[in-house]
């Protein structure tokens, strides 16, 4: 069983004939966007079974492999799962530990919190999210602005992304932003659950998105998501076809 982008596994595919004589190869895969990546055809054909993380990927696998005699059991839709033991809606937010968490990060000072929880890379469009926050705040009254905050839970700067502290200093000099990494860096499972439950809306404007674990976890915590209709994010939006499926 292997996973992630096929380009990392070319060495495996080069000897797939020898391997598959004794051991089946399974690929847990995802692809962000259309059109179908026909250049991956031979990579897909190097596996005996392909399990797709998103419905879009499942369609891609089926369309590409249909002409090569792959049977239904060889392509399956197997989405990511979220366990209640890790992420769940907190019904009683008066809990002492929850309130201490909010106070630690300054989240208790605001009534409306917008969460960015993605890698700081270009295709996630972090600067666009900050700009959207600015446009929203510009339309509010001064009193309403005091109740809102942009919560950034990711590396503030990344060589593959954006210097978000510089962006926010320039673009949002008068609007509040909380950089959680200023207060301890990454969080454990309990803290992550508190973060989702503390925030009101999760936003992901990525131009291409394989699945979108953050938005799925936010839904699991009973929150609201704002997302682009792309890749696996479509699976979370509740869209149905003409058959209601």
Model-derived features with residue positions:
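Extended catalytic core of nucleotide-activated donor transferases of GT-like folds
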Residues: 1-49, 55-56
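Conserved donor-binding/catalytic core segment of Leloir-type glycosyltransferases
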Residues: 103, 107-124, 133, 150-151
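Aromatic "clamp/platform" in nucleotide-sugar-dependent glycosyltransferases that forms part
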Residues: 207
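Short hydrophobic beta-strand element within catalytic cores of glycosyltransferases
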Residues: 224-227, 238, 244
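A short helix/loop element that forms part of the nucleotide-sugar donor recognition site in Leloir-type
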Residues: 88-107
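Nucleotide-activated donor-binding/catalytic signature segment of Leloir-type glycosyltransferases, i.e.
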Residues: 18-19, 161-190, 194, 243
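A short, active-site helix/loop in glycosyltransferases that binds the activated sugar's phosphate group
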Residues: 35-77, 82-92, 162, 166
